[in-house]
Swiss-Prot record:
Binds 1 Mg(2+) or Mn(2+) ion per subunit. It comes from Colwellia maris. InterPro entries: Isocitrate_DH_NADP_mono (IPR004436). Its EC number is 1.1.1.42. This is Isocitrate dehydrogenase [NADP] 2. It holds the Pfam family IDH.
Amino acid sequence: MSTDNSKIIYTITDEAPALATYSLLPIIQAYTASSGINVETRDISLAGRILANFPKYLTKEQRIDDALAELGELAQTPEANIIKLPNISASIPQLEAVIKELQAKGYDLPHYPAEPQNEAEESIKLTYAKILGSAVNPVLREGNSDRRAPASVKQYARNNPHSMGAWSKESKSHVAHMASGDFYGSEKSVTIDGATSVNIEFVAKNGDVTLLKSKLPLLDKEIIDASVMSKSALVEFFETEINKAKEEDVLLSLHLKATMMKVSDPVMFGHAVRVFYKDVFAKHAATFEQLGVDADNGIGDVYAKIARLPAAQKEEIEADLQAVYATRPEMAMVDSDKGITNLHVPSDVIIDASMPAALRASGMMWGPDGKQKDTKFMIPDRNYAGVFSAVVDFCRENGAFNPATMGTVPNVGLMAQKAEEYGSHDKTFTMKAAGTVRVVNSQGERLIEQEVAQGDIYRMCQVKDAPIQDWVKLAVTRARATGTPTVFWLDENRGHDEQMIKKVNTYLADHDTTGLDIQILEPVKACEFTLARVAKGEDAISVTGNVLRDYLTDLFPILELGTSAKMLSIVPLMNGGGLFETGAGGSAPKHVQQFEKENHLRWDSLGEFLALAASLEHVAVTTGNARAQILADTLDAATGKFLDTNKSPSRKVGELDNRGSHFYLAMYWAQALAAQTTDTELQASFSSVAQALTKQEEKIVAELNAAQGPAIDLNGYYFADTKLAEKAMRPSETFNTILSALL
C-alpha cells in the first residue's frame, strides 16, 4: 500500500469557519494520522493576507509567509489537494477594521490611503487592492466548478423540509433593471487570432492618449470583451425607480456584489446612495468634502465621519438624513432594530445571498417597522437581472417551491484562470473624462472601441480557450453520469456569449453526446426551463459562466436545502490536482456575533465533512493509498448517520452547537471505521475509540454544552488569540483525551 505524497492542505480562513476549524481539524488530524496522510494548514485569512503582503513594516517575528501565493503555485501541479473554507471577500470598511485591529496588537501596518497623496501611498493602496474583494478564489481556481447537492443531503432536505414563505398572486414584488446604457447593452467581444498583447488606451476628446493598462498578454483563441455602464443612465435609472417605489408602496432595495466586483459595484452603490440622499449631499457638500465622505462606502460612511463634528452640526446632518426618509420610499433593512438600511454598507446586501433569502420569504424583505413587505429589487445590469426576475415571476404565478418534492439543479461553472467578469478588476476603470477607450494589439490593430463619458464604468473581461474546452468536457461528463437534461445558459444577443456559443458548438462536437439532452438557451429561457422541471420534482444541470455559477450555486441550494453551505463543491484542477470547497456560503459574521455574546457557534460544518470525504477519495485515486478510500467511505457513512439523527447545530444557546456536531461526526466515523472489515488494523485501532466515545457520549455532550452561555472574548475578531480560540472551541477534556490516543 502506497502512502507516499498523501498531503492535504486545510485552509485557515475567517469568522465562523475559522472558529469551527479549531474544533474540527484536531479530529481530522487524529483520524488520518495512522493512514499516512498529513493534513497541513495554510493561513489565507484576511489578517494573514495583509501581514504576508507587508513584511517590511513588521518585525522578523511578526512576518508570515505568503500562503496564498504558495497555494496558487500548488494548484497548478498534479499534487494539489486543497480543502478551501469560505473566506472574507473584503470591502474597504472591512479592510480598515482589520488594519485597525492588527495595529492595536502591535503590527506597524500602514493605514489604507483612500486618496493617495504621493507615490509611496499609491504603492500601499495598490498592495491593499490585491487583498480586497475576491482575492483568494481566482488564485486557487485553476479548474472549473462541479457543484451539486449530495444525495444524502438532498434526501435529508426532502424528509425535513425547511420553511418557505407562501407567495401571493397579488405580490407587488418585482425586479427593476435598466433598459439601456448598461454593461449588457454596450458589450462588444472578439476572439483573438494568434497570441498577442494588448494595451487599453483612453483617447480624450482633444486627442491626448492615456495608457490605462499596458502589455496585457492574450493567448490564441482567447475571448475578450469590453462594455460600459453609463453613469448618466444609471443615475436616471435610480431616480426613476426610487420614485416608482414610493408610488407603488413597496420597499426599495439594491442588489449588487460589491465584495466580488470590487471595482465596479461599489461605484454603482455610491450612485444609489447619492441619488437617494441627494438633498443631504447637496446641502452639506462642503462639509462632506472636508470630512472625506465616500458614498461608495455607503451612507454608513456619513454617520461614521460626522461623529467627529461638533454636536450641533452633527445633529443637524442627522436630522436632515432622517428627513429624507419622510419623502423617499421605505428602504429594505439589514437590521431594522439598529436602523441599518440596505444602503448603509456595500458589503451588507450581496445579491447571491440577498435575492434567494427574499425569494424564500414570499418575495419580501424587512422594512423599517420590522415587518416584511413586498419589495422592488433594483438589479441595474441586464446581464443577470432577468434570471432573478424569472424566479420572482414563476413564484408569483405558481407559488413557493416545495423542498420536500422539488428537483435539484447541479452546476457546471466556468471559472478557471480568472474567467470572465471575476477576472476583470485590473481592467475596470471609472472614467475621469469623456472620450474613447480602445483595446489595441501589438500590431497596432484596434480590437474593440467604446465611447465613454465622465464617470462611466469601463470594464474589459477575458476568458482563455483551454478553460472553455475543459468546461464543455466537464458538462458532457456530468450529463453522461446523470442522464439529466443539461443546459448552457448563454445569450446570443450578448457580445461575449455570442463568441462563447461558437466555441461550445465546436467543442461539443469533440465528444460523444449520443443520447444526451444538451441544449443552449438564453439565461431567462434557461431559468424558466429549469424552474418548470424543478417544480415537478425533476432535475436540470445548469452550465454557466463565472457570475451565474456564483449566483445559481446560492439560489438553487437555498431554495432546495435552505442553505448553500451544504453543497459538494469540487474543482477538478486542470493539471490533475483537486480543490475541494466547503459549501458556497460566506463566512457567517452573525454566527460569530452570537458566539461572542453567548459562546454558542451555530456554524454547520456539513460542507467541511463533504469536502473532506471528496479530498480523501482524491488521495486514494491519485496515490493508491487504500486507507484513504476507507476513510472516505466511512466518513460518507458517518455523514449520512449525522443527518439522519439530526445532529446539526441548533441556533439556541444551551443546545448542541458546532462543537457538539463535530463530536457526533467523530463518534459515527469511529463506529463506521470499527465496523468495516477491509483493513483489520484500522478496525482494531478505531474499535477502542468508538467504544470510548459511545460510552462517554452523555458526559462529552454535557461538557460541550456547559461551556455555553457567558460572553466570550478571544482578544480579536479578525485576528483572534489562537490559544484562547483553541481553548474555547475544545472545552471537553474527556473528548480531547480520547482523540489524543490516536496520535
